[in-house]
Amino acid sequence: MNRRSCAFIFVTGGVSSSIGKGLTTSALASLMQSMGFRVCIRKMDPYLNVDPGTMSPLQHGEVFVTEDGTEADLDLGHYERFTGINCTHRDSTTAGRIYVDLIERERNGEYLGATVQVIPHVTNLIKDFIYSGSDQYDVILCEIGGTVGDIEGQPFFESARQVAYEVGKENVIYIHLTLVPYLEASGELKTKPSQHSVKALNALGIQPDFLICRTQSAQMSAADKRKIALFCNIREGNVIEAQDVDNIYKIPLIYKEQGLDTKISALLGCGPLEAGVSHWKEIVGRTRSLANSGKKLFVAIIGKYSGLCDAYISVDSALQHAAFAVGVNLSVQIIDARGKDMSDLSKFDMILIPGGFGNNGIDGKLLAITHARINNIPFLGICFGFQLAILEFARNVVGIKDADSTEFNKNCKAPVICFLDEWHRSDSSVERRRQSSQVGGTMRLGGYNCVLKKESKAYAIYNETEVISERHRHRYEANPHYLPELEAKGMLFSGYSEKGCDIPEILELKDHPWFLGVQFHPEFKSRIFKPHPLFLSFVRAGLLRKYS
């Protein structure tokens, strides 16, 4: 379905943050894909950080890394997993990035002495981001982070208003998500917060075309929808209910059942097209049957951000993708490496240590690695987990008692993990970093090739592919000086960076059924319809150990 001009769908939220804008945007994009539209999804975050790379996962959830090395909001992970389309730097921005660009332009004299203001200068830069590459798509879906009424979000809402003015309202749709709370004491749903949220949006010059009402257990009545439609000046049929679900892949089906797909296509002047959802029905049906499966695995994610499940959302998703493909019910528990739950890991069939930074909780993580190594429990270490697996092995097997990482101890006597100061980009140019560089600028980010050793477990897992590509986010690496000692005791480094610097990328233990560490982040490339081979093999190893 090729439209003569690109349409823009803006997804906004009110009443509460974390209301599901990213999942709604992802689900809508997948529905529009199935109708034949060429879609693109973009995220605009109003916070003043240039990117989320230096933000605490406890505040903002995980940092998602795109193929081109962009550190982005976790919603881009949802976008990729629902649509299968890889996002780039053109699909994510923040108020901080916009203002940095603005100040640089002003300092370079690009505004020719004009008084630089929010309107038109900031809004013009935001619109440049929105319009970028629009000739390649039929529909661009733009999610505005935060909630209506946030002071830092006003330039983004104003830009969304201006887009309709510039391209014509017939080419723009506004979708607003609100929370409809249920008061147990009175036994009723309350619509007033939604009314006030839409009123605040109206004050910014935007009248939503659709209102998606998030509810919990109580279902909205026809009277509730009529009331909201009347007070919010929205067609009754365009008031969509979105109840909490136990499986996010039900969301496209929920919107399809209420005709959101046909209503959007009709509003865009393309007729009442219908989305194909048979693939989502299959996913939901199979996951429902897995919940009743007799085979169940328990996996522990040992981290330090246990207070927020979104901190490891891509890892959890990748595990569930693999479990779905293998046909096993998987229970994932995030364990605080500093907490009392570390005292008993015997109930877990698999152990995973994800990416992270700093020495907080490393003792617990090292204990978990030792437990997995000694007891032949399937183990996967990702990024920081890869480095800690080397550290544990160096101390407890090789006998390097002073083994440490310069991340924790800059003056350590045996730096088995050290600062990564040079590597080759995909275009063969050399990237260099110093420890004195800005914190946000010392990472090796994005997709890089890795060469696998034949006859290794990794080579078999990747279907005997000699060169693979994975996404990275790290500033420390295994110190090549210590690799011979480690390999002499049974640790095989089965993957290395492809060009020039020979950075160790994959480790495995020769005398362990399944013990792997990877310097990269395989979770970022896993999809529900194409699970990542490492996670598939990891889950199969857990299944084999428990049920063989």
From Swiss-Prot:
A single MF term (Gene Ontology): glutaminase activity
Which residues does Mg(2+) bind? 75, 143
GO cellular component, as recorded: cytosol
Q: Which residues form the Glutamine amidotransferase type-1 domain?
A: 305-548
Active site (catalytic residues): 383, 521, 523
**Pfam families per the UniProt record, alphabetical:** CTP_synth_N, GATase
Binding sites annotated in the UniProt record for ATP: 18-23, 75
Pathway, according to UniProt? Pyrimidine metabolism; CTP biosynthesis via de novo pathway; CTP from UDP: step 2/2
Sorted alphabetically, the keyword list is:
ATP-binding, Glutamine amidotransferase, Ligase, Magnesium, Metal-binding, Nucleotide-binding, Pyrimidine biosynthesis
**Annotated catalysed reactions:** UTP + L-glutamine + ATP + H2O = CTP + L-glutamate + ADP + phosphate + 2 H(+); L-glutamine + H2O = L-glutamate + NH4(+); UTP + NH4(+) + ATP = CTP + ADP + phosphate + 2 H(+)
According to its UniProt entry, one GO biological process term is:
pyrimidine nucleobase biosynthetic process
Record-listed UTP binding positions: 17, 190-195, 227
HAMAP family (UniProt xref): PyrG (MF_01227)
Q: Which NCBIfam families does this entry report, sorted A to Z? A: PRK05380.1, PyrG
Any extra detail in the entry?
A: CTPSs have evolved a hybrid strategy for distinguishing between UTP and CTP. The overlapping regions of the product feedback inhibitory and substrate sites recognize a common feature in both compounds, the triphosphate moiety. To differentiate isosteric substrate and product pyrimidine rings, an additional pocket far from the expected kinase/ligase catalytic site, specifically recognizes the cytosine and ribose portions of the product inhibitor.
Instruction: Name the family.
Output: Belongs to the CTP synthase family.
Q: In its UniProt entry, what is this protein called?
A: CTP synthase
Q: What is the lineage of its organism?
A: Bacteria, Pseudomonadati, Pseudomonadota, Alphaproteobacteria, Rickettsiales
